[in-house]
Amino acid sequence: MLPYSPMIEEAKRQIDRSLEHFMSQIKRDYKLHLVNPILYKSIREFSLRRGKRIRPLLLILSYKGYCPARKRISSSLYHASTCIELLHNFMLIHDDIIDQSHLRRGKPTLHKILGKIVRTKRREKLGYDLGIIAGDIVYALAIDAFLSIREAPQRKERALKYFIQTAAFTAMGEFVDTLHGVENISKIKEKDVFLNYTLKTARYTFDCPLVVGAILAGANEDDIRKLSELGVLIGQAFQIQDDIIGIFDSQKNIGKSILSDLAESKKTLLVCHAYRTLHSSQKRLFIKLFNKPQKTYQDLLAIRKIFLCAGSLHYSLRQIQKRLDATFTILQHLKIRNKYREIIKDVILRLFKHSEGIAHRHHLAI
């Protein structure tokens, strides 16, 4: 993939520097290292792991796109943008505990690291308990980071409220996702899947960064509403792609166990479509494989084949494209500066190279 423009690369470097600076600041302000050196060290290491930084980047691009052209951009914007990355980390920490995952971004999950603080037969339980607490700390730090923005008080208060509402919506999505995991597949409808995608992924990954940046910059109400709609569409498409990658990509590329989504029996669009489309013996085989408590790599290959035969991969890829088309239609009508419209479009397109590659490998036109 071609590198981002120099402006985007510099913005990402500034986000990383701001995140590192914030980690040093909380060491001074909260004295986490005095409570327990491993607590601070593990939160810092987890937060600074390499990532796309897509959420803070979108917040910054949205803000710059709507603020007056001659306005000097304060460094506090980059510092505050880390709030959305910390919110992301908080979600990941708790999500990994719920899913009992061992890997995150190619390294041990935070609860696995914390479970090794002391030698005990109850190491796994200890790791889960400490991970929940560490996640709560990271959420509080996210709000602290947000408060560092220097902007008009009314805008700041409204943006903070939106940020907190987003955290609540995302937790609701996690709640629904966890319930879906134990419900019979026959009870899950496509609309339930998309509601979960909206709550658990779209709200905090795209909707919140774009809307918060626009609110802080003083964007008009119509554009704020459209940005929220656009964010939900991209977020749904992004989660569909993530589900596809979890089945059709390699563990090396995704940085977590390739069997994790299958092990948790997640009710994805792929799963929902296959169940609805398959008949008789094929459906019975699919249900048998899907409901197995301990799935093997051979089971994964069999489920991949079923998704291909049922047309579920093709259907899911077309749903991604449908949402991207709608996204770019909305983007074209926003009253955002054209330079940032094009940059945001480029950032979005780059996020979907994985699904393009998978479609190409399986000779599927979308």
Feature annotation, model-predicted:
Residues 1-366:
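All-alpha prenyltransferase/terpene-synthase fold signal
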